[in-house]
Amino acid sequence: MENKKFYITTPIYYPSDNFHIGHCYTTIIADSIARFKRLSGYDTFFLTGTDEHGQKIEKKAKECGVTPKEYVDKIVDNAKDLWASLNISYDKFIRTTDKEHEEVVQKIFKKLYDQGDIYKGEYKGLYCTPCESFWTETQLDENGNCPDCHREVHEVKEEAYFFKLSKYQTWLEEFLESHPDFIEPTSRKNEMINNFIKPGLADLCVSRTSFKWGVPVSFDENHVVYVWIDALSNYISALGYLTDDDTLFKKYWPADLHIVGKEIVRFHTIIWPIMLKALDLPLPKKVFGHGWLVIDGGKISKSLGNYKDPREYINAYGVDAVRYYALREVPFGSDGNFSEEALVTRTNSDLANILGNLVNRTIGMVNKYFDGKVTNTKIYEDIDNDLIDYATSLKENVTTLVDNLELSNAIDKIFDLFRKCNKYIDDVTPWILVKDESKKGRLECILYNLLECIRIGSVLLQAFLPTTAERIFKQINTKETSFDTIEKFGNYESPNTVNTPEVLFARIEK
């Protein structure tokens, strides 16, 4: 079989302050997809990191009385600790202050300049420092402020280098037309085409002289490379592009999936494709722009300061409660409201009631009725068919949903199996069967069916709630945890002895 590869990225986050639940949301989703692909047999590379240059960080560091590098080092250490506490399984964490990255950026800038795609000119425009974005008069909000963060913009005028986006306008339009799935969801694609591309692409300012915290332009020391050529290059610099060792680049590029927030879709679907075209490199297969998590209708953001440390939620409710909420609550692509109350409700209704209760009841019955040991007696009845059919088709159905980036539906599909198991218990009434000695073999088959369904669901759950899946494997005492063990029913060990049940998720009283 052909060696399957999968390269997935989060955006590189801007470490102007500690990360919030919005950063966690993006990263948990990317991590779950990466884990699912690994479990499905893909040679997977999962990249995340930080975009550390720019005027805003230079200014923040000055206010704190430290160098920009000292400032970002502290934030990055905090971010890595947060990712560890969320079980984020990235293969590489790239920083734009890494020497290797800076050298690649300089080479890319020089290459584009040498071939005439970058030229020197003068920039006049309106600049939003918090967003690091330039705007025209017509793009400002009704108060004349930044349309993204609604803060004041400042007029700037300075010598700058420009990237000829306009040269590639027709090519980009034709590319998007011939690759309809490149930008998802469709609403973002339509927004890019109608609001940004069709009105005409202006050449892009790609250097600055008004601050120094950035990658120096190698042939003009007065300039630093402005954010997007620096930041976007991370996806290829992380793989060793234009270095002595480009093994990873040859192996994994082009990326299969860039996951980004909707506010940076335009940079990833206009500037990035044009950069790659100018460098004569293949384009990523898909850019998915997800929605925002909102609090009381407003975006959770560092600049608004309307959030608390995500570790408070992890410490209060457990890592997998936070992961489950992020994956299940909001259909990927839409905006969704974040509330601690909803997190508690989800934890109680789904994790404690549906899953926790099922595992506890099943192991409890095996211990009570069969001293903890169960064998597959294969004394099936018609009532088993629906459950077994659902369980054996689950991998294929969940895989389709993950491939379509329907993460909320994918995890709900797994929980549908657990719901069916709970209903199955109510329908087959083990507590009545146990009173009839002649039904003992049938009762044992029922409990085996339940343990096998719990195993199958948990094998898939590994991608989303890895800690919980491991705890379930331990409690039901199985080593059959790979994806290829769940295509047919009956791979749970037989005979087998279960372990003592433990509470997976305690009900939260609020």
What positions do the PLM features span?
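Basic, alpha-helical terminal appendages of large translation-related enzymes
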Residues: 1-5, 45, 49, 121-126, ...
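Short, charge-patterned binding micro-sites
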Residues: 50-56
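A charged helix-plus-loop insertion that forms the helical arch/lid used to bind
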Residues: 60-73
